[in-house]
A protein has these predicted regions:
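Bacterial Sec-dependent N-terminal signal peptides
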Residues: 1-31
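N-terminal carbohydrate-binding accessory modules
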Residues: 26-129
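Extracellular glycoside hydrolase catalytic/binding regions
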Residues: 43-47, 102, 200, 206-227, ...
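An active-site-proximal structural segment forming one wall of the substrate-binding cleft
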Residues: 47, 103-132, 142, 146-179, ...
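Feature marks short, surface-exposed loop/turn motifs that line or immediately flank catalytic pockets
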Residues: 71-73, 138-142, 181, 234, ...
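C-terminal/domain-terminus segments
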Residues: 138-151, 338-346
Length: 346
């Protein structure tokens, strides 16, 4: 049996916030003078939102630096270097056809137990990172078949050990529902069927809210968790402008509905809201006051690595006076990524 080489995508995460620390295009030449001042503890054991900033319990400002644990709980074909077999259900079908369903179940169990281990979390912490983003599929919290199981407790088993590793090595954790009921993107990344049915299906929307409430009930008192990222990259760009606009108009309402469900059991954690069209379009949002612990999140994979290229995102952050979190960058040259990392923080 040939071994399968696993490719982990380590995507830099940086939080860009604060009036004088905002996506400054310094190119590494201009330095920001930082004043020494006494810290005032927040009185909370959780990271909190204060204007455009995140504040640690000790009163210090938190600048997120870290990585995604992509492909672990949401397998994506391109991370295996597959061309057309590009999501979990396709990979599962391929393995089952080649080696049988029993082997497929064994494969997925071995994959989950070995793809990310405590040693990986220790290494991430050693690099100077302070945060990990954990993408996951909603099916880990249902009886639907997924990665060789149909056990609604599997998601908690995987999250529990990740939380303990993060606690041990001093890392924050963001829970990212990368694959939502019905599919929220309409592309392979949501493990769906080519259309964001979440925006058409009441049953999918209710399940989406119910799962987030279940997760929040479990982790409401867990300070390792920085926040809940409700969905990843909703509404892709391959649909018509009219259809995109129709679904964009529903996005904020679904976010509000899920937030209300979470707040029934958890008032401690931050809610992260991604823009539509690859987490890049924030025009659908009109009400950023519906909760007092909100943070928006964006992604960047192309264009110039300059401040001008992300000025619309900066302007939205400044208008809302809320933090903006760069959740993913990558798929570019090393030089582009190095230049963009200089653009974001100061």
């Amino acid at each position: 049996m040939k071994r399968t080489n696993y490719l982990i995508a380590a995507l830099s995460l940086l939080l860009c916030m604060g009036s004088q620390h905002s996506f400054a295009a310094t190119g590494g030449k201009k330095k920001v003078k930082k004043e020494m001042k006494m810290l005032t503890p927040t009185g909370s054991q959780y990271v909190i939102v204060k204007g455009k900033n995140l504040i640690n319990p000790d009163g210090s400002q938190l600048y997120i630096v870290g990585t995604n644990l992509g492909n672990w709980l949401n397998p994506e074909g391109y991370m295996f270097n597959f061309r057309k077999t590009n999501c979990e259900w396709m990979i599962n079908l391929m393995v089952s056809e080649l080696a049988g369903p029993d082997f497929a179940r064994e494969f997925w169990q071995a994959f989950k137990d070995n793809y990310i281990t405590e040693a990986d979390i220790a290494y991430i912490a050693q690099t100077g990172a302070n945060t990990i983003r954990l993408p996951f599929n909603y099916k880990l919290f249902t009886r639907e078949d997924y990665m060789g199981k149909n056990d609604e407790t599997e998601g908690f088993r995987m999250m529990d050990k990740t939380i303990e590793w993060c606690r041990k090595y001093g890392l924050h954790l963001i829970l990212d529902m990368h694959d939502c009921p019905g599919g929220q993107t309409g592309d392979n990344i949501d493990n769906g069927h080519g259309y964001p049915w979440l925006f058409e299906s009441e049953a999918s929307q209710q399940l989406f809210c119910d799962i987030w409430k279940t997760i929040a009930q479990k982790y409401k008192d867990e300070p390792v968790i920085l926040g809940y990222e409700l969905m990843n990259e909703p509404i892709a760009t391959m649909f018509s402008k009219e259809l995109q606009a129709e679904m964009n108009a529903k996005l904020e309402g679904i976010y509000k509905r899920a937030t209300r469900a979470i707040r029934e059991v958890d008032n401690n954690h931050i809610i992260l809201l991604g823009g539509s069209q690859w987490n890049g379009n924030f025009e659908p949002f009109n009400d950023w006051k519906f909760d007092d612990k909100l943070m928006y999140t964006c992604h960047r994979y192309g264009g110039e690595p300059t401040q001008a290229a992300i000025q619309k995102i900066i302007d939205f952050r400044d208008k809302t006076q809320l933090p903006m979190y760069m959740g993913e960058i990558g798929h570019n040259t090393d030089q582009w990524q190095a230049d963009f990392c200089k653009t974001m923080p100061t």
